[in-house]
Amino acid sequence: MFDKLKVTGLLLNCFERRNDTDIRSMVNDNADVPTKYVLAILWYKVSERQGKILDYMKLSLDADLLPKTHAAGGEADIVYEYEATEHYPSHTLLIEATLADSANQRRMEMEPVSRHLGQHLIRTRNMDSYCVFATNFLNINVISDFRSRKTTPYYDSQDYTQYVEGMKIIPLETSELKRIIQVSKTYKELYPIFEEAFNSVLPPHMWYDNCIKNSI
């Protein structure tokens, strides 16, 4: 539906500027969740159009396949399933997206992102699964929190015997999403970048620029 120029030159630029009206006009005048919808389309292209994208979106669509409602509160925005290949193991990628500003981002996103991934890992026991958090602006303390999750246990609040030792959360700003589309990066190229970034020991204030921005 969206070509490369529209995704990078129009939609992603609107995300950066928080121009919600223009985003809705390009997707659907009645669409409440265009951010998640466009990100799903973008990631489908990155994944070389593999998989059941309509299932992965976790959106209710209208007759024109445009979004009406977003994921339920207990579920990630996009849940992408990958079968094992020579490039990566079988895993699930949870994708969370927000246009929250710098003041609200930490409060709004840190808890639900960690909760969605933690619950998924406890339920599936596939520790190769992880989360990408996409946003127009990254608060340094959000980066710090997500990096700390690498070694922080997450417990099932109803059963303390059920927990995971840590989790992998990769934050991405809109500028990097634009770069991914502009240079036609594919998921099999991004996966090792994310894995190396996850295993890095750099402190949070150095980590994003060195491990994500400069690698994409």
Predicted features along the sequence, with ranges:
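Catalytic core segments in nucleotide and nucleic-acid processing enzymes
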Residues: 3-216
